[in-house]
Amino acid sequence: MVVEKRNPIPVKEAIQRIVNQQSSMPAITVALEKSLNHILAEDIVATYDIPRFDKSPYDGFAIRSVDSQGASGQNRIEFKVIDHIGAGSVSDKLVGDHEAVRIMTGAQIPNGADAVVMFEQTIELEDTFTIRKPFSKNENISLKGEETKTGDVVLKKGQVINPGAIAVLATYGYAEVKVIKQPSVAVIATGSELLDVNDVLEDGKIRNSNGPMIRALAEKLGLEVGIYKTQKDDLDSGIQVVKEAMEKHDIVITTGGVSVGDFDYLPEIYKAVKAEVLFNKVAMRPGSVTTVAFADGKYLFGLSGNPSACFTGFELFVKPAVKHMCGALEVFPQIIKATLMEDFTKANPFTRFIRAKATLTSAGATVVPSGFNKSGAVVAIAHANCMVMLPGGSRGFKAGHTVDIILTESDAAEEELLL
């Protein structure tokens, strides 16, 4: 079914229509060092207990707890040191009555011992030491399997592999990892007014900023990107390049050509490639004419030619589609609360997304609009790390109001907590 009329739908419904499509990428196996930012295709289980053995979390002395009973400031108890081991070494001594093994962090607890005394809790002599407090069984010991046991699920299918997950995979010996193949993306900027970055400016022309921006956004997600030659406002060539892109890529992103002008051909292109239009208008600003279609398991995104609207469309709609195709556990944008630090008095007949700068503090998040915020603005994008989401039907917001924000970058510094 092709949607002919432009009936605006809510942002959340638009995202839901995208993720309702049956589109998934195949599982592949990659080397551990190539797995960053991929999504796991299966659960990862612990291949052994961690710790693998009872070990010391401190530098100190391994003793029998029973020998420490009765120790006090007035009754210091003495121990004789019979061995010295570091991490990776195992003592062959059996700890006996009032004996101890000098032990370093990470070393295996020797036979006979069941507690560790930290160095700072002792008074050391040449080959003996004394303590002034009793220790209980297993005190200051990391017990075998207390973190994970063999067979425990340590990473879930659908989880994004971040540096911490890399550490887990390496710990359990996963030199290769089964992940979901990431989709490839075609980026096609359209408009007879567009010049390439190296071109000399001409009257009535602007440089193509959307193409490089979308490429960067996609590559930031770890996606393979194909850049196509900037397309003039011509229907036949537009159909041809979109067909070519669909043959080679899983996602096709066009910028421009989605409005209602005389040279906006995207609706006709979607008809020509037999794509089902999921929606062609969203109740939001900027980017209300964002159009998304689906054909043969592939997404076609028609993003606005206005830079801020184009950026907003990628964050709200392309990102969830990529996550959905890769089987991610969470696909919807994450929303957090923040305190607005400046007035924003513009009325919002539809949900409005404002480029802004968020700061996470010990008292919570604060946010300030990032300069000029019209849909065609470019500079505000560079200085933003989030989008403020103002609900439709609101008549502006004052400083001090709580608003919803979507983080788009990870540099929302906790000012009071900076080193």
Curated annotation (Swiss-Prot):
Provide the E.C. number(s) assigned to this enzyme. 2.10.1.1
- Top enzyme category: transferase
Q: Which domain of life is it from?
A: Bacteria
Q: Which cofactor does it need?
A: Mg(2+)
Q: How is the cofactor bound?
A: Binds 1 Mg(2+) ion per subunit.
* Protein's GO biological process: Mo-molybdopterin cofactor biosynthetic process
TM ranges are: none
Q: Which reaction does it catalyse?
A: adenylyl-molybdopterin + molybdate = Mo-molybdopterin + AMP + H(+)
Q: Which GO terms describe its molecular function?
A: metal ion binding; molybdopterin molybdotransferase activity
Q: In which pathway does it act?
A: Cofactor biosynthesis; molybdopterin biosynthesis
Q: Name one GO cellular component term.
A: cytosol
**Keyword set, alphabetical order:** Magnesium, Metal-binding, Molybdenum, Molybdenum cofactor biosynthesis, Transferase
Recorded coiled-coil stretches: none
Q: Which InterPro entries match?
A: MoaB/Mog-like_dom_sf (IPR036425), MoaB/Mog_dom (IPR001453), MoeA-like (IPR038987), MoeA_C_domain_IV (IPR005111), MoeA_C_domain_IV_sf (IPR036688), MoeA_linker/N (IPR005110), MoeA_linker/N_sf (IPR036135)
> What is this protein for, i.e. what is its function?
Catalyzes the insertion of molybdate into adenylated molybdopterin with the concomitant release of AMP.
Q: Which family does it belong to?
A: Belongs to the MoeA family.
- Name of the protein in its database record: Molybdopterin molybdenumtransferase
Q: Gene name?
A: moeA
